[in-house]
């Protein structure tokens, strides 16, 4: 029996560490998306050339932030943060 308890404790610890890694990655993704969005929303050339892409970047970022704060998984947060970054990049390319 002690072997099964030890195995269970080890598996539980691994799952907790994986969850921490996912959370850290989602926080990093959010921070990068926020930085990219801040740059494009402050650039008048980008706002003039690609307003819809800037709006989409902001909407995707807002969704990622909502998901991170209460009910989304880390993969959901990472996905919407990625979309926000891509829309920011697309907007910048149009300027």
Predicted regions and their residues:
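Amphipathic, heptad-repeat alpha-helical segments
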Residues: 21-66
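Short, flexible active-site loop motifs that bind/organize anionic cofactors or intermediates
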Residues: 10, 67
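C-terminal motif of bacterial Sec signal peptides marking the signal peptidase cleavage site
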Residues: 16-19
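Long, amphipathic alpha-helical segments that form or neighbor coiled-coils/leucine zippers used
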Residues: 69-95
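Bacterial N-terminal signal peptides that target proteins for export
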Residues: 1-8
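Conserved anionic group-binding/transfer micro-motifs
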Residues: 3, 57, 84
């Amino acid at each position: 029996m002690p072997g099964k308890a030890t195995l269970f404790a080890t598996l539980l610890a691994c799952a907790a560490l994986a969850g921490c890694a996912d959370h850290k990655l989602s926080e990093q993704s959010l921070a990068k998306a926020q930085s990219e969005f801040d740059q494009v929303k402050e650039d008048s050339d980008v706002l003039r050339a690609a307003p819809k892409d800037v709006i989409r970047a902001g909407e995707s970022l807002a969704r990622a932030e909502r998901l991170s704060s209460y009910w989304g998984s880390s993969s959901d947060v990472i996905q919407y943060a990625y979309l926000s970054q891509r829309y920011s990049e697309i907007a910048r390319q149009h300027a």
